[in-house]
A protein has these predicted regions:
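Extended, solvent-exposed, turn-rich assembly/linker loops in the middle of proteins
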Residues: 20-106, 110
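Short, glycine/acidic-rich hinge or "gate" loops at secondary-structure transitions
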Residues: 2-21
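Sequence/fold signature of self-assembling virion shell proteins
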Residues: 35-44, 87-259
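Intrinsically disordered, low-complexity, compositionally biased regions/tails
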Residues: 12, 21-22, 30-32, 53, ...
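Surface-exposed loop/turn and secondary-structure junction residues enriched for glycine/proline
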Residues: 12-14, 80, 211
């Protein structure tokens, strides 16, 4: 989810209990695909989210990319449907003189009738993380006020390789090891005083299959931070994993929220 909302993911001791070699790992999305809205979407009076979406779709088309899906957090969709420009555009489109109820279905019907039809997908993910002090908490990995433009919902894969502990003869003598898919679970103990540990580990990283065809728009109207080098670390997966990798499906699922 961070890859889709930031074109990279952020690692630090605060959100990752493992080894941190780089704080921001980009997915390879070109800097020219970094977009921003004309105005902050939270300003319902001046923002024009539908026009921002159309402008990005047209810009992508000029690069040979046909956008089909517009993915955003449910809270950002709520900002879009509250904008005066959205209400005015839809009211004129349905040719209604009375009040209309702005919903995701209605907005998607409007977008489907445009020269380059697209569909809005809303997400509201939640994941558990553990920091270096082994404190666990639930976070939403999607960066707020970011909208992702995609050709296909099959965004990428989790690529994974072998784990060093698997081939350790010494470890195999003192621990029980079980491999489930690409996650290695190791269990071992000490006698005096008796202690027992269980550890799960993986040599894996999420990878966007076609970062050139992904566009991300900041909808706060502000420029991208220079530290978000979305294209500068495109070689990380190959150098990190080695030669042998296996794909894992990461297809996006639409939520029922945002109506």
């Amino acid at each position: 989810m961070q890859l889709m909302s930031r074109a990279g993911f952020h690692l630090s001791a605060k959100n990752n209990g493992g080894v941190v070699t780089a704080e921001f790992v980009g997915c390879g999305m070109p800097k020219k695909n970094q977009r921003k809205s004309t105005t902050d979407w939270s300003n319902a009076t001046t923002a024009n989210g539908l026009q921002d979406i159309e402008d990005t779709v047209v810009a992508a088309s000029a690069e040979g990319v046909t956008i089909r899906y517009v993915v955003m957090h449910v809270a950002d969709f709520s900002l879009l449907k509250k904008q005066k420009s959205t209400f005015d555009t839809l009211k004129a489109w349905v040719n209604s003189s009375s009040k209309i109820l702005v919903t995701k279905n209605l907005i998607n019907e409007y977008l489907a009738e445009q020269e380059i039809p697209v569909k809005i997908i809303t997400v509201n993910p939640a994941v558990r993380i553990e920091d270096s002090a082994h404190r666990r908490k639930t976070i939403n990995p999607w960066e707020r006020k970011r909208v992702c433009f995609l050709e296909d919902l099959k965004v990428g894969d989790i690529q994974h390789g072998p784990i060093a502990a698997e081939s350790s003869a010494t470890l195999q003598k003192i621990a029980l090891m079980v491999k489930q898919d690409w996650i290695l679970v190791t269990k071992w103990s000490e006698r005096e005083p008796f202690k027992e540990w269980t550890k799960a580990e993986a040599n894996a990283i999420p990878v966007v299959n076609d970062p050139d065809a992904m566009f991300i728009m900041k909808v706060d109207g502000k420029d991208w931070n220079a530290s978000e080098d979305t294209e500068g670390t495109d070689d990380i997966p190959a150098t990190f994993l080695g030669e042998t990798v296996e794909p894992e499906d990461q297809t996006i699922q639409d939520t029922e929220n945002g109506e």
